[in-house]
Amino acid sequence: PNGFNEVSAFMSDNPFIQYLMQPILLIGVVYHFVMGFVLEAQNKKARGPVAYQKYNGAANASWMSRNMLVSGSVILIFLLLHLYDFWVPTITDHYIAPNPEFAQGNYFMDHLNHVFTLEGALSFVRLVIYIVAFVFLSLHLQHGFASAFQSIGARHNKYTPVIVAFGKWYSILIPAGFIIIAVYHFFVK
């Protein structure tokens, strides 16, 4: 708990993170999401007004590549919930209506535990939402990681298999770590 609180306090008090990195991250997420919609619209426009007579999406593209907009939308909804759960209370308790508990050492860990120990079934529903969102994040990353390299022209017989393999591991390990954190805080109250 102490390490978690120290890192969280560092991030909430560090002007570099709060006033430079956080806005850049927000702009990047919004840009990424908007470009996802733009790309989807361009793809639909390129197909024309007539639908395919017979469409076999699996013939040329994986399920993940065909459903990036779906997984991205689930992730965006989750991000809004996550901001509501953590960012809004932190900003409120730190800047808007200062809470004396904020200066105490366990504020962040206590708040994290609170989110997953809400009224009975609500905390279980919250846990399920987090897990489902992280599964969608895994699917989104599995396609998006290698696809990002291909989009910037980094496609080569020698390097692409390494990028794809790294992307698969990355897309499993990062969301799995987030799932472990959520499950841990649900069961360790």
State where each predicted segment sits.
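Membrane-embedded alpha-helical bundles that constitute the cytochrome b-like, heme-associated redox core
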Residues: 1-189
